[in-house]
Amino acid sequence: MAALEKNNIYTARIEGYSSEGLGIARIDGQVVFVHGAVRGELCRILVMKVLKNAAFGKVTELLEPSPERREPDCPYYGRCGGCDFRHLSYREELWAKRQRVQDALTRLGGSDVEVEEILGAADPLYYRNKSQYPVSAGKVGFYRARTHDVVDIEHCLIQKPQADAAAAALRDYMRDFAVPSYDEKTGRGLLRHLYVRTNRRGKSLVCVLANGERLPHEEKLVGRLRRAVPDCAGVVLGVNTRRGNTILGERYRTLWGADTLEDELCGLTFRLSVPSFYQVNRDQAEVLYRKAVEYAGLTGGELVVDLYCGAGTITQVMAGGAGRVIGAEIVPEAIEDARENARRNGIENVEFFCGDAAQLAADFAGRGLRPDVICVDPPRKGLAPEVIAAAAQMAPQRVVYVSCDPGTLGRDVKRFAEYGYRVQRAAACDLFPGTRHVETVVLLSKSEVDSKKIRVELSLEDMDMSEF
């Protein structure tokens, strides 16, 4: 087997896609990740980088193009790192995402369950209800792939028009008043990120994240943002003086209007503060949550624990079919929103606790809480081993795992198997059209013999929860 050489051109066929959205080819038995390639294509590939176990390249000539290839519809494609799949038909994109989930569950999770048909989006454009634009060197846009270099973006095909308009207003404000942007390397500069959340009715909440307590000419910035975003609910300053690239602030100050935004999801109303987690694709989130409720198998009397509950969306959707639901979340503002949302929606069979998921889960388990269902929707890094151990100690009949990263999902599925929990069903849901990212819902349960063990029934009234 001859070693691949940098700057040489080889001929190979694309076999599939990597987790990063790159085409996969094999040349002389070696894996090559190929930018902009489509499954099934025969290509001439220029090798640009050679590592010990793999190489990276790009297509120089298409010898046999795929019928699933399309001309990218975004002028920033290839520069902006936001959308990986704008050169694919949507049918091929959905195939790639479902296959990514299947590979993760099989190779990493050791599961032989076949992933159900992927739940695709009805509209793959302008779907993001939350936009976060990094700011750097006077530019407001998105990072170049695998870098923190910002590409200035005037119009994005997956953001709401209100977000692009706010970005233009911030860009002009920086230029007109010589306001410096933040430099990650030096820790100096002021403007770090622009955050825009838009609800179903088109009303928006704007937050400017800054490396300081005040902005120059704040009233001018507010005026420009209000003119750019006609139905603006409020403008908030988020103070983030930490080094690095953390987005959200340590504290917030309202510059004008409201500091929260209301939205409707699954027939319920949710108040959302800036730090509260809320799925960015509202329509597909409803599809995702319906699948999660289906997997939970609720009949009206179950006790459900929802870890990483955010503003209480899944918690309150589950509450409609359960006896009682407990939500846990580490962000105080999100818990405040969750409690207020339950009050507004008239939902009385929910209770929320603020704290670290691992600590709360361990405390729940130690106090003898025995839920019928545990639902988890962790961040991209997945579940800590301590969370899985505590969840298993609570001995639920079913675990519903909502994941935004197939890799960490596969890892966690394997860890759950150590406690006897196996994947029973799995479904992929496309909340992020145009990108490589995909959501997954997995149902885990123990074997039939294990699930028939005698369960200890405890109500919350029987437990001392005063320390939470």
Regions found by a protein language model. Give the residues of each.
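Terminal RNA-binding accessory module
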Residues: 1-76, 351-352, 359
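Rossmann-like S-adenosyl-L-methionine
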Residues: 2-8, 19, 213-468
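Residue-level signal for inorganic ion chemistry
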Residues: 25, 40, 83, 194, ...
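Short, solvent-exposed loop/turn elements at beta->coil junctions and helix N-caps
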Residues: 117-124, 184-185, 191-193, 428-431
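Short, aliphatic-rich beta-strand segments
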Residues: 196, 202-211, 269-273
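Short, acidic/hydrophobic/Gly-rich beta-strand patch recurrent on exposed beta strands
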Residues: 23-28, 141-145, 209, 338
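Short, conserved phosphate/pyrophosphate- and ester-handling motifs at nucleotide-, phospho-/glycolipid
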Residues: 40, 159, 281
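Extended interfacial segments that mediate partner engagement and assembly in macromolecular machines
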Residues: 60-72, 78-181, 201, 215
